[in-house]
């Protein structure tokens, strides 16, 4: 797994590549899977991210990874879209995914509440939602969890797309 310093450096460099190709950089995730170190780059595009987009980004990011001395035979790059049920982790994600339907859990009057609402965006230190025709502002520090949900009308992301590359293949 990457050190915090290496991770921050890698996120910054990958973000520049992703943005230069016309996409939003959402996250860099790491995991171990069957002895392989998986580096997963999560990206978003409008109206969606295709497999072709993931392939294009993989080709653009891979030379950067291969330039690092720590990148070896057991390292694996995966470029993926956020998917249908992405948990929103950073405040700026609320702006990127505005207009989408979310399930949001938050504290209200000392109790936890979960509702399905339309994400309007963010405003100062609040997430703004539309629920039953009314607009509400929920302070970020009261949000326990917010995740994208699939909208039957097709407004949400399609099937999660990804493209993977293992060094040496």
Curated annotation (Swiss-Prot):
Any one Gene Ontology BP term: translation
Pfam families according to UniProt: DUF150_C, RimP_N
Keywords per UniProt: Cytoplasm, Ribosome biogenesis
Major localisation: cytoplasm
GO cellular component, one term: cytosol
Subcellular location: Cytoplasm
InterPro entries: Ribosome_maturation_RimP, RimP_C, RimP_C_sf, RimP_N, RimP_N_sf
Primary role: Required for maturation of 30S ribosomal subunits.
Family: Belongs to the RimP family.
Cross-referenced HAMAP family: RimP
Name by which UniProt lists this protein: Ribosome maturation factor RimP
Organism: Coprothermobacter proteolyticus (strain ATCC 35245 / DSM 5265 / OCM 4 / BT)
Gene it is expressed from: rimP
